[in-house]
């Protein structure tokens, strides 16, 4: 990978694309591809790429964008006409993250560009490389491919460029133009929706006058009833067979109140059907029934409150706390009774037990239990007690060493509790005594050294004897 950076020329210019997939940093080769870089920077300054989509995605190959129409056929350069290709021997499609101009043929560069997603040797000397994606933003570039794609390599939910920011402009003479973006072509469905509604020509119909009158009446009624709910009474006000008097009298207090409030309206509307006496009788019946119902409801509510007093949550918690206290107290009493029974049993056993080893064992046990009860369980008191015991042991040890007797101590004293402190460790002297080499003993080993002069003489003498024997034979 290092040889790639050595081969590629240094960059001069930087642009930041803010996309829906994240920010993408692009460094430009403005010396190697000046026309393409000038075109790209000026379009960014003019906000030409803002809200444009990446209309083509080929996984593992390229991601293409820069077309304001979003179709893949639009977009133009700052020069007004397509500009020429700019190839360089040190710029090759040998890795991902390169930025190049998209074109439909030689010298046909406009506003569209693409990112490479891998090695693409087939694009060399066909498309102008003018920049590269740098840093960790290359991963945001790869996120542009994480979309569903149709058969025509178009993403269904495409990412888009939100805005562009020129971080370093190598061309000081660029003056942004004030241009309008070409609008996207609207689909056929939207065009159909925007078509104006046709006007009705009633003169063509044989019953045109009647139809026109009905149309006007319907429009007038719909305007008057706009925003209101409609019922059969609203639509059929003039029907004499419909009456506003309910067939079944309401038993609820709210309905009775509504009937009292609307009494004047009902009386004014139905004077034709109901006389004044009948109206008074009806009102009296309704008032009596209303009083009766309200008294019964109050009575029932009072009985319900007496019978069912709602128990609050706090009252329940108090009851539970009292119950737990009772249980804990009972458990403590039971434990105390058990301990008393056990103590009685122990005392009975001690009285019944004979003197001897068992009695001595029990005395020792009681002694250590008493010591254990005296010990503090936790805290500074336990620590102080431990240090006091340690100091006591040290003083006892130093005293025993100082008072060590010169004479040997018998084994009975050594086995005593404090006798081992003053005991001196002594070993039996088992060193071997020196023996005389000339004295033969059962433990004496024969040492033979061939370099010894005595042994040499013996060997020579034995050799002479052997020669003489051979000569005699």
Curated annotation (Swiss-Prot):
GO biological process: protein folding
List of residues that carry N-acetylserine: 2
Keyword tags: Acetylation, Coiled coil, Nucleus, Phosphoprotein
Subcellular location: Nucleus
GO CC aspect terms: catalytic step 2 spliceosome; U2-type precatalytic spliceosome
Region: Disordered, residue numbers: 178-197, 203-383, 401-473
Chief location bin: nucleus
Sequence ranges of Basic and acidic residues compositional bias: 178-193, 231-241, 267-348, 360-372, 426-438, 458-473
Pfam families: Pro_isomerase
Residue ranges constituting the PPIase cyclophilin-type domain according to the UniProt record: 11-166
Motif (Cell attachment site): 252-254
GO MF annotations, alphabetized: peptidyl-prolyl cis-trans isomerase activity
Residue ranges that the Swiss-Prot or TrEMBL entry lists as coiled coil: 206-230, 311-378
Modified residues (Phosphoserine): 347
Role summary: As part of the spliceosome, plays a role in pre-mRNA splicing. Probable inactive PPIase with no peptidyl-prolyl cis-trans isomerase activity. As a component of the minor spliceosome, involved in the splicing of U12-type introns in pre-mRNAs.
Subunit relationships: Part of the activated spliceosome B/catalytic step 1 spliceosome, one of the forms of the spliceosome which has a well-formed active site but still cannot catalyze the branching reaction and is composed at least of 52 proteins, the U2, U5 and U6 snRNAs and the pre-mRNA. Recruited during early steps of activated spliceosome B maturation, it is probably one of the first proteins released from this complex as he matures to the spliceosome C complex. Component of the minor spliceosome, which splices U12-type introns.
Family: Belongs to the cyclophilin-type PPIase family.
Name of the protein: Spliceosome-associated protein CWC27 homolog
Organism whose genome encodes this protein: Bos taurus (Bovine)
